[in-house]
A protein has these predicted regions:
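C-terminal motif of bacterial Sec signal peptides marking the signal peptidase cleavage site
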Residues: 18-21
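Acidic/polar, low-complexity intrinsically disordered N-terminal segments immediately downstream
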Residues: 23-102, 107-115, 297, 313, ...
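Extracellular carbohydrate recognition and processing domains
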Residues: 124-159
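Short beta-strand-plus-loop segments that form exposed binding edges in beta-rich domains
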Residues: 168-176
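Short, solvent-exposed loop/turn segments at the edges of extracellular beta-sandwich modules
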Residues: 174-175, 307-314
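Exposed low-complexity, polar/acidic, P/S/T/G-rich flexible segments that act as propeptides
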Residues: 175-220
Length: 331
C-alpha cells in the first residue's frame, strides 16, 4: 500500500497583534499485519484454535466463520424460503367460564395487512374475510374447554413463511350464555439451514384489532378499555397482564353482540439478522493472539478486518482470511 499525504490549511492562530497560518500533514501509514495459526492447534471440536498476530494493526474485528458470524454474510438480511428447515407457531391458550366455544384461530399468507387507522379502508377487508368464513386462511385447531389452565398448541406454518399472518375471531352466538375468557401467549420459531434459529415473541408481532359489532361502529379499533367484553394487548395502556392477549368474557346477556377480529400484520419469516463480527482489539490493547473454540466439525473461513489509526497516522481497513477444518475428537 502506498503512503498518501493530504495537506490542509490549519486554522488561523491569533498571536497578540499578528496572525499566521501553517500547514499540517496527516499521514496515512501503510498497514503491516499477518495472522498465523498456532502450531499447537489440534483442530478438534472443544479445543481452542489459536491465531497469532504480528504487525502494527490498531483495530481488529474477527468473524469466526461459524453460524451467524461469516464475513460474506455481513449484509445478508433474507434467505431463500427453501433454506427454512422448519417454521412453527406456538400458541399457549387458557380458556375460562362458559360452555360454548367463542374463538376461531387462523393463519395464512394471502393477507396484505390492515391500515390500522383508516376504518373505511379496513372494514371491507375484514367484512370479506367474515363473509367467506376465512376461506383464504387455514383454521388452527385447539380443544375448547373452560379449565382455566394454559395449554400449548404447535402449528406447522412453513408453507406460509413468505408472508405469514395469523389472527383470531371472537363471537357471541347465543346471548343467553356466558361469554368465555381467553388468554393467549404466541411465539414463532424459525429454523434455518446455516443460520441461527429466529424466534418471534409477542413483542415482535404487531396486531391490529377490528370489531364488526354494531355497538363499535364508530370505533372499530376499540381495545384495551376497562371492563368486560374487550380485547386487550399487553404492552399498551390498559393491558391485562395475565397474558399477552386477553379477551375478558362476561355473564349471559351483558352484551348484545361480539364480533371481534384481530390480525397480526404480515411478516416474511425468511428475514434474518445480518451476520456479526466481534471487535477484539482497540488502539490501547496489546493483543498478540486470539483463541476461539468451535463446537461443530466443519471447514471454517475466519476473517480478520484490521486497520491502523493512532497519532502517527491511519490506514484503511483490510481483510485477512484463514481457512481450516475442525473435526470431532478421535476416540
Amino acid at each position: 500500500m502506498n503512503t498518501k499525504r493530504i495537506t490542509y490549511l490549519a486554522a488561523t492562530l491569533a498571536l497578540a497583534t499578528a496572525a499566521a497560518s501553517c500547514e499540517h500533514e496527516e499521514i496515512y501509514e501503510p498497514l503491516e499485519f499477518s495472522v498465523q495459526l498456532a502450531p499447537t492447534n489440534t483442530y478438534r471440536t472443544g479445543d481452542p484454535v489459536v491465531f497469532n498476530f504480528s504487525g502494527n494493526a490498531d483495530f481488529i474485528t474477527v468473524w469466526t466463520g461459524d453460524t451467524g458470524h461469516e464475513y460474506k454474510h455481513r449484509n445478508r438480511t433474507k434467505v431463500d424460503i427453501t433454506d427454512i428447515e422448519s417454521c412453527e407457531l406456538e400458541i399457549e391458550i387458557s380458556q375460562q367460564y362458559g360452555t360454548l366455544n367463542n374463538l376461531v384461530l387462523f393463519a395464512g399468507n394471502k393477507f396484505a395487512g390492515l391500515n390500522g387507522s383508516d376504518a373505511a379502508t379496513d372494514r371491507p377487508v375484514v367484512e370479506a374475510i367474515a363473509a367467506n368464513d376465512c376461506a383464504d386462511w387455514t383454521k388452527l385447531e385447539f380443544t375448547p374447554n373452560n379449565a382455566n389452565k394454559f395449554e400449548t398448541y404447535t402449528y406447522d406454518i412453513t408453507r406460509f413463511a413468505d408472508r405469514f399472518s395469523w389472527g383470531m375471531h371472537l363471537f357471541y352466538p347465543d346471548p343467553k350464555t356466558t361469554m368465555r375468557t381467553y388468554r393467549i401467549n404466541p411465539k414463532i420459531t424459525v429454523k434455518f439451514k446455516g443460520h441461527d434459529t429466529q424466534v418471534y415473541n409477542y413483542p415482535d408481532m404487531e396486531f391490529v384489532p377490528f370489531s364488526l359489532a354494531s355497538q363499535h361502529a364508530d370505533n372499530p379499533y376499540i381495545h384495551n378499555v376497562s371492563g368486560n367484553g374487550n380485547l386487550k394487548f399487553q404492552g399498551r395502556p390498559g393491558a391485562n397482564n395475565t397474558a399477552n392477549i386477553v379477551f375478558q368474557g362476561f355473564s349471559a346477556g351483558a352484551f348484545p353482540e361480539i364480533d371481534q377480529w384481530a390480525f397480526m400484520q404480515p411478516v416474511a419469516l425468511n428475514t434474518i439478522s445480518p451476520d456479526t463480527g466481534l471487535n477484539i482489539k482497540g488502539v490501547t490493547d496489546d493483543l498478540p493472539s486470539y483463541s476461539y473454540t468451535y463446537t461443530e466439525p466443519g471447514t471454517y473461513t475466519v476473517t480478520f478486518i484490521v486497520a491502523g489509526g493512532n497519532y502517527q497516522g491511519q490506514s484503511a481497513p483490510a481483510p485477512y482470511e484463514v481457512t481450516f477444518t475442525v473435526i470431532d475428537p478421535i476416540e
